[in-house]
Amino acid sequence: MFPMVTEFMNYGQQTVRAARYIGQGFMITLSHANRLPVTIQYPYEKLITSERFRGRIHFEFDKCIACEVCVRVCPIDLPVVDWKLETDIRKKRLLNYSIDFGICIFCGNCVEYCPTNCLSMTEEYELSTYDRHELNYNQIALGRLPMSIIDDYTIRTILNLPERKT
């Protein structure tokens, strides 16, 4: 055959193949148009976190025995535990406990290994501030329970997320 005719046939085949690929991509786009939106309007709508969510740490001062297990298991040695040895009863007395959430990686090791369960993870994740020194929480700030998202009437909570089809 003539070289010009074979080039024209190859060009036609490439055009048909390109149109097929464009059509396949367009069909995928149309299949996604039927789904519910995944994004939420954050300050006005909030997701309810799972029970395994690792948020801000809650601390109960009365349960702590100042054993410093939380400091030893922390990958960055973050919790600061100040204690005094009571010589008459031979026990440690906790003076101060603080965590800097600007440095904390929320790994949960301190909560998992605490022998008295004085540490727990809350559902609070809004820790933003303009001054990073405000992220250093002492035992009083750590002892405050966060307001539950469910109980806040100003925020619409989203209970069920649309499930993704894979």
Curated annotation (Swiss-Prot):
GO BP annotations listed: photosynthesis, light reaction
Positions annotated to bind [4Fe-4S] cluster 2: 74, 104, 107, 110
InterPro entries according to UniProt: 4Fe4S_Fe-S-bd (IPR017896), 4Fe4S_Fe_S_CS (IPR017900), NADH_quinone_OxRdtase_chainI (IPR010226), NDHI (IPR004497)
Transmembrane spans: none
Keyword Metal-binding in annotation: yes
Keyword tags: 4Fe-4S, Chloroplast, Iron, Iron-sulfur, Membrane, Metal-binding, NAD, NADP, Plastid, Plastoquinone, Quinone, Repeat, Thylakoid, Translocase
UniProt membrane topology term: Peripheral membrane protein
Record localization: Plastid, Chloroplast thylakoid membrane
Cofactor(s) required for function per UniProt: [4Fe-4S] cluster
GO MF entries: 4 iron, 4 sulfur cluster binding; iron ion binding; NADH dehydrogenase (ubiquinone) activity; quinone binding
Reactions catalysed: a plastoquinone + NADH + (n+1) H(+)(in) = a plastoquinol + NAD(+) + n H(+)(out); a plastoquinone + NADPH + (n+1) H(+)(in) = a plastoquinol + NADP(+) + n H(+)(out)
PROSITE patterns linked to this entry: 4FE4S_FER_1, 4FE4S_FER_2
Binding annotation for [4Fe-4S] cluster 1: 64, 67, 70, 114
EC number assigned by the record: 7.1.1.-
Summary of the function given for this chain in its UniProt record: NDH shuttles electrons from NAD(P)H:plastoquinone, via FMN and iron-sulfur (Fe-S) centers, to quinones in the photosynthetic chain and possibly in a chloroplast respiratory chain. The immediate electron acceptor for the enzyme in this species is believed to be plastoquinone. Couples the redox reaction to proton translocation, and thus conserves the redox energy in a proton gradient.
Family: Belongs to the complex I 23 kDa subunit family.
Name the record gives this protein: NAD(P)H-quinone oxidoreductase subunit I, chloroplastic
Organism of provenance: Encelia californica
Gene this chain is encoded by: ndhI
